Regions:
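Short, Lys/Arg-enriched N-terminal segments with co-localized hydrophobic residues
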Residues: 9-21
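Cationic, low-complexity basic patches in intrinsically disordered or flexible, solvent-exposed regions
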Residues: 3-4
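Mg2+-dependent phosphoryl-transfer enzymes with acidic/Ser/Thr/Gly-rich catalytic loops
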Residues: 22-26, 43, 210-290
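Asp-based phosphoryl-transfer active-site loop
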Residues: 25-38
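Active-site phosphate-binding/coordination module
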Residues: 44-145
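Short active-site oxyanion
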Residues: 57-61, 85, 174, 234-235, ...
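Short, structured coil segments at secondary-structure junctions
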Residues: 78, 83, 91, 195-197, ...
Length: 290
């Protein structure tokens, strides 16, 4: 297990050689709880620093469980279309090239699992099950307060359908089960046992259960992307705070946990930066990228 180091202990800025600074060519960022603060905003100093490192030739990647409509506005704020950045949406099930809008990788759930998963989920009290079109969130049971949190984060309307599986006539990158944490804690292992080898099922937040195509997580898709670019994991810094960031933090040459990260994420990281409300990403840039 990697041993985390606090920002106060590991004062690296004046210790890194120029060669070490140039080692890292890629910066990959989770969004909620990492790039954005508690107001879901990118602070001006962090935005300026991220644009600066792109101008200097670094590749910026945004990697999120959000749908593409929830990622793209932040990519535009960071001017990623100018500098060759990439967006990993749906926890890596879709990779989009910012400069062209081209989808260069896309994985969908097997359609025949949608109805049985839906039927299992609907037996749980108070939960919802949702997926996404390009413009809206589709609710299969009826929105709960966690559904509305997801809608607010992504600025998307919610439409409830009477027959969720029948309504999904298009490729589905992921389904999300919003619900009370204690309900999801019981549901998750049940679904994992039923769909072992078919689906990737995990919680991104205590109140969000992600249902993904087999083997899809942020690390898997980053590996595909880096390989296509002729780069390695050792050349990448990954920053995150949640359960769904674990794979990429363990995969990266430098895995960084936010001070506000889940405990298991901090335990897996090489370095712990400041919180998302204290410009933690700016701190990483100052220490390791300039």
């Amino acid at each position: 297990m990697k041993q985390p180091a606090s920002a106060d202990i590991r004062k690296r800025q004046n210790l890194l050689t120029q060669e070490e600074h140039m080692k890292y060519q890629v910066l990959t960022l989770d969004l909620d709880g990492t790039l954005t603060n508690s107001k879901k905003e990118i602070t001006p100093p962090t935005r300026e620093a991220l644009i600066d490192i792109q101008k200097a030739g670094r590749i910026l990647i945004l990697a999120s469980g959000r749908p593409i409509n929830g990622v793209a506005p932040l990519a535009r704020k960071l001017e990623m279309e100018k500098y060759g950045g990439y967006m990993l949406s749906f926890n890596g099930a879709r990779i989009t090239k910012c400069s062209t809008g081209e989808v260069i990788y896309n994985r969908a759930l097997p359609h025949d699992v949608i109805r049985p998963v839906f039927e299992e989920v609907r037996t749980c009290p108070g939960v919802d099950i949702i997926t996404y079109t390009d413009s809206e969130i589709i609710s299969g049971i009826g929105p709960n307060r966690y559904t509305m949190i997801e809608a607010g984060i992504n600025k998307m309307a919610v439409r409830t359908v009477s027959d969720f599986p029948a309504a999904l006539t298009f490729p589905i990158n992921k389904m999300l089960v919003p619900g009370d944490p204690e309900i999801l804690e019981e549901l998750m292992p049940r679904l994992q046992n039923q769909y072992h080898g078919l689906l990737n099922i995990y919680r991104s937040e205590p109140h969000f259960l992600e249902i993904m195509p087999r083997n899809i997580d942020k690390a898997y898709s980053l590996h595909r992307l880096l390989s296509s670019l002729g780069l390695s994991a050792e050349q990448m810094i990954c920053c995150g705070d949640g359960y769904n960031d674990l794979s990429m933090i363990e995969y990266a040459g430098l895995g960084v946990a936010m001070a506000n990260a889940q405990t298991v994420v901090k335990e897996s990281a090489d370095f712990i930066t400041r919180s998302n409300d204290d410009d933690g990403i700016l701190h990483v840039i100052d220490l390791f990228l300039r």
